[in-house]
Amino acid sequence: MSTTTTSRPASGRAERAPGRTSGAGALARSLRTHPELWALGAIVAGGIALRFSTLGLQSFWADEAVTVGRVLRPSLWSTLGQVHSSEATPPLYYILAWLWTRVFGHSEVGIRSLSAVFGTATIPVVWWAGRTLVSRAAGIAAAALVAASPAMVWYSQEARAYVLLILLSAVGFGFFAVAVRRREGRMVTWWAVASVLALLTHYFAIFTIVPEALALFVLLPELRRRVVASSAAILAVCGALVPLAVHQANQGHDVWISNISFGTRLDYLVKQFVFGYHGSSSSVLTVVVLAPLLATAVLATRGSWRSPGWRLAAAIGVLTIGVPIAAKVFGQDFFFPRNVIASWIPLAVAGGGAVAVPRLGWAAVAALCAAFVTMAIAIDVTPKLQRSDWRDAAKALGPGVRPRAVLGADTGANPLTYYLRGAHKVSRGRVTVSEIDTLAFTAAPVRHARVIPRGFRFAGRGSSPGFIFERYVSDRPRTLSVGALSEVRLEPAHSPTILQEPR
């Protein structure tokens, strides 16, 4: 005779309705049954460590100094006015940065932490896009590549709009992937929303949006009306941005791009995408990174070529770079590595396709991630691979004890104005000073035929990492023209004179 026992709930606890669980319990079971989420969590944790641990290590460079020293003002309205006149991008990043700095401040760590958040958020977004378009394994591999990439870490530690462009382009690419896979019209709409936000961050989001829109039009014939309507909405936003873009272009912020040869810019593209902004510091490190990179590329092509999603990711990545190159033919020269940095996302998804090759694929991706982390650490410990250290240069110059003119090295006017308290730029006219400090990059050619103004005598020479400077003083303040001061420069490159009054 069998005996049936009935289990009872623990004292003081009510039984849960069948099928209903707590949020924490659901998450715990999901983690147990989905090791993919554990892998993603570990990858995100590694990405956080790489991005947040060294936020304050490097000085602001020239463009970051513009962000914190000129664009971000006490009022949001004044900030938008500075974006209009001082920047070459739409205002979305600066609105978010203005809000962020109300809480976290304008220091290197304070404002860059916003970029680090954006950079970290990009990692799971790329996982989502990769697993949707190619495979779950490819999504994990792509997320790992983005987490470890020196280029992605670099922009995640920069107080500029590029990392928000990367994040929003990744979100748009994710919705694009879902739209292609599920063939759902609402996903096309969400793709358009993400694309508009990317455009409001940076005009060059269009380089990714155009090939994605064409792909949606071709691949989703049953949704073409939705694709056309969504593309028209994006085009309307582009039209609304035209007056701002034209005004900013007339300020000449990007004219320097065309002064760099196309071949040199292609070289920069490879160096910056693979090794970080300043390239590799040694031939050994170059080989350590390039060998697994080439292996990953070959294995990805071999293992995933038959996958339509993989081919689509590779095509979007290549076309994001190709669109501005094609525009150059028509006289619109915007091609520069950071202007096509959003291509890193679909290319990472394509690279993640290497794991389709059993064992060798995962080995290649793991080796490439290890090489990327090695390169990122090398940047942290090698000053010449970092941003120019204007912060230490300002410390070496010391506080101004008398009215002085500081003749900065090329690109140094904005960061020196920021780090030298009470300083401002002077482009013309005359100044009254009793000290002249002239600064140059250590590696720059030094002018030997210089004219020291009458009444000034040599008072010493100093240095800081990456810079040298000379100081000339006078027994009394003397009035000099900006033109006369330019004859004292150590470097032949022109940079505005900085006037600093003692406090």
Regions found by a protein language model. Give the residues of each.
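Short, intrinsically disordered terminal tails adjacent to the first/last structured region
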Residues: 1-33, 368, 501-503
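Membrane-proximal helix-loop-helix interfaces that form the catalytic/acceptor-binding platform
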Residues: 3, 31, 35-503
